[in-house]
């Protein structure tokens, strides 16, 4: 599975790189698209030691530092992985607030994918605060725009997740929520 990075900033929305069009054209019909959304405290794209250069990294020559695509078994010929990078730095409160506008940007990206790649199923994977971005994005999408959602250690209040789960997009897809005790405070409200 090829990997394309989508940069998001509050002012201009998601920036679709030129290589995305090339990667989409090279896909076989029905090949999956997998959108990876990181969580709290990842560096901005202009910072040199950005951790998501590791977690979103395609398969390396050595296997000591496996990124999400390789750990998920996403081979280069299977489909297209899109890493959605958003500003989740600063205090937890500030990053939590940034999740809402990032969700709007993610929804725009997914709507664009629905237009330019309508025959490719989309899976969203959100980790930690990235799960809030994913669930909030579902609220602005049409039915069947997403096939699967995987939430890993979601940082999203239960009430907000339940509201998002009632959206047409959420009703038309499978949602898997992998939990841990580390985020139990978010399950209360």
For every predicted segment, state its role.
Residues 2, 34, 44, 49-73, ...:
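Serine-dependent carboxylesterase/thioesterase catalytic core
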Residues 23-28, 113-117:
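Surface-exposed acidic, glycine-flexible loop patches that form ligand/cofactor-binding
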